[in-house]
From Swiss-Prot:
Protein name in the entry: Holliday junction branch migration complex subunit RuvA
Gene: ruvA
Region of interest (Domain II), ranges: 65-143
Region annotation (Domain I) ranges: 1-64
Lineage start: Bacteria, Pseudomonadati, Pseudomonadota, Gammaproteobacteria, Vibrionales
Location(s), subcellular: Cytoplasm
Cellular component annotations (GO), alphabetically ordered: cytoplasm; Holliday junction helicase complex; Holliday junction resolvase complex
Subunit text: Homotetramer. Forms an RuvA(8)-RuvB(12)-Holliday junction (HJ) complex. HJ DNA is sandwiched between 2 RuvA tetramers; dsDNA enters through RuvA and exits via RuvB. An RuvB hexamer assembles on each DNA strand where it exits the tetramer. Each RuvB hexamer is contacted by two RuvA subunits (via domain III) on 2 adjacent RuvB subunits; this complex drives branch migration. In the full resolvosome a probable DNA-RuvA(4)-RuvB(12)-RuvC(2) complex forms which resolves the HJ.
Keyword Lipid metabolism: no
InterPro entries tied to this protein: DNA_helicase_Holl-junc_RuvA_I, Hlx-hairpin-Hlx_DNA-bd_motif, NA-bd_OB-fold, RuvA, RuvA_2-like, RuvA_C, RuvA_C_sf
Family: Belongs to the RuvA family.
Any one biological process term the GO annotation gives: DNA repair
Parts forming coiled coils: none
Keywords of the record: Cytoplasm, DNA damage, DNA recombination, DNA repair, DNA-binding
UniProt-listed SMART domains: HhH1
């Protein structure tokens, strides 16, 4: 099992990245709440990974800390929640927000996440509340900040908007919804990561 990667960040295409380790490039999918904290392209990154083997693919999901990965592993233990939905859940809200929503049994907030209906939200609360009991979000997970993300290298506002829409589609949002939200919040000087962050905030 691949549990940790340390290497040079080659590409950032939210929610995916490419990291080179000893001459080998690894494609990794990462929740946007973690993606914002990545270093610049060309710099060294350390990523904790969850390895998934399927009949048709081998997938890596990446996180900045062991604690964030631990939460992801707890999320995908819930009935009906796979890695793809787990990625969407932890992109739509931060680790601390998710823990708080489960502890408060806040179904109305959870159902705003892509792919999460009322039944899935209820299962998340029922199955995870006891497992999260006593877990302090502040102690367990990297706090989410409003610090400006690094420039993802977008060459124009149009390409930034296209990348943002593509990222939202990859997370499970519908094309019309993704395009509408991005167009509403887009400003000429915004990077794709800033657009994604603001879009996700507006939809939860």
């Amino acid at each position: 099992m691949i549990g940790r990667l340390r290497g040079i960040l080659l590409e950032k295409q939210p929610p995916e990245l490419l990291i080179e380790v000893n001459g080998i490039g690894y494609e990794v999918q990462m929740p946007m709440s973690c993606f914002y904290e990545l270093p610049n392209i060309g710099e060294e990154a350390i990523i904790y990974t969850h390895f998934v083997v399927r009949e048709d693919a081998q997938l890596l999901y990446g996180f900045n800390t062991v604690k964030e990965r631990a939460l992801f592993r707890e999320v995908i233990k819930a009935n009906g929640v796979g890695p793809k939905l787990g990625l969407a859940i932890l992109s739509g809200m931060t680790a601390s927000q998710f823990v708080a929503s489960v502890e408060r049994e806040d179904i109305s907030t959870l159902v705003k996440l892509p792919g999460v209906g009322k039944k899935t939200a209820e299962r998340l609360v029922v199955e995870m509340k006891d497992r999260l009991k006593g877990w302090s979000a502040g102690d367990l997970f990297t706090p989410f900040t409003d610090a400006a993300p690094v420039d993802s290298g977008s060459t124009s506002s149009n390409s930034a908007e296209e990348e943002a829409v593509s990222a939202l589609l990859a997370l499970g949002y519908k094309p019309v919804q993704a395009s509408k939200v991005v167009s509403q919040i887009a400003k000429p000087d915004m990077t794709s990561e800033q657009l994604i962050r603001e879009a996700l905030k507006s939809m939860v």
